[in-house]
């Protein structure tokens, strides 16, 4: 279109013949050389979702390192955790970060627990005798939780996020709980409609048709191999190939973390999370961006497909 407009421009028509041909040739070459960059839109789309952001300092410094690379990504923040404000302050600096609310109803780490944003007295059916969230999905589902208290607490987490100054795109369930029963799923969908947010899941049943891949349960020794295998087998038909990651720096703080739900993570969560961070920072991953696949976020998917 630009070339056609140029040809009809009176100034172009006044150029000597040879200069016209030279200019047209230059424009065509530039257009050709620019084609691979434009063609990035035809590549499979990969969506990196980083969970548990705001959980502790080691997680926050890890997401800061990812953000500094400039790659687009989605970050699910736990607004019920003590370190959430640091995560907010970090991610405000990076427009490449898309923000989600990691809806939290459990506190799974031994000797490092958190409770409801609303306060223990406001949602007594959601907490243990010490006022903390229950330690596991099973414990939560077997408890006499009240749906109206779940709604009150999750609404408070979303409103804390919306009031943080970050632009929030979506909500997703920590440990899958907020989507784990028909009643909880209906409630989460209600909240998404109320606050005009998308929903990301922790299963293969997704809202935007994105494929689901999770590195969490993979042994440290084979994590990167699995990650690269996912990238070697991307679906071009899916709106996005989502990869859920849990990252952190292997610091003394993270080394002391003990997941009460997983023997694999009970004393090795630090190495798991450092390995997943290393995968995303690796040259072998970074060299494939915009060549083998295009990185997108939930903000992009919502823009492409709408909220419903």
Regions found by a protein language model. Give the residues of each.
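Bacterial Sec-dependent N-terminal signal peptides
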Residues: 1-40
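Active-site gating loops and adjacent loop-to-helix segments of metal-dependent hydrolytic enzymes
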Residues: 113-140, 258-268
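Acidic (Asp/Glu)-rich catalytic clusters
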Residues: 63-69, 86-98, 116-128, 163, ...
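Structural preference for beta-strand elements that scaffold enzyme active sites
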Residues: 45-47, 72-76, 96-102, 168-172, ...
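Catalytic domains of cell-wall/extracellular-matrix polysaccharide-remodeling enzymes
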Residues: 144-236
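C-terminal domain-boundary segment and adjacent tail
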Residues: 199-202, 262-308
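A short alpha/beta connector and helix-capping loop motif
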Residues: 57-81
